[in-house]
Amino acid sequence: FVLGRLIMSLDKPYLDVPGTTIFDAEQSRKGYHLNQFCMSLMTAANRERFKADERVYLDEWAMTEEQKLAVLARDLNRCIALGGNIYLLAKIGATDGKSFQQMAGSMTGMTEEEYRNMMIAGGRSVEGNRVVGEDGDAQAHRQPQGSAHAASQPKASA
């Protein structure tokens, strides 16, 4: 019976939704220390310590090296993949003086204005975005992957 529940918990049909990471129990466990770090930024003294030396402050947390590097790069898509909760990751943006709208835009490869206009117009089209493998704009191959991704992209020829 316990094994049956374990197997059911591994069956995640929602993993086929492109551009979406569901913050479930597995993600929560994976990102526990990352999310605790984010919560610490709710205190002014901790924000100041983080801004004074980000790496030193991050090293006080039992986060994985990959999580720390994602925070340092402000690669929020990677932070989410590593268990970060978007509502807690917003504390990093607030510490940087960014609005949630600016953060969300950066995660989609849009400017703040483009993101705002898309949301006002009703969000992304479901066409091409219903399941992984289609060719819509929410598909993983069309998403920015942070500064490391941008740096690895070939430069357009003149």
Region locations from a protein language model:
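Short, Lys/Arg-enriched N-terminal segments with co-localized hydrophobic residues
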Residues: 1-7
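Charged, low-complexity intrinsically disordered segments
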Residues: 7-158
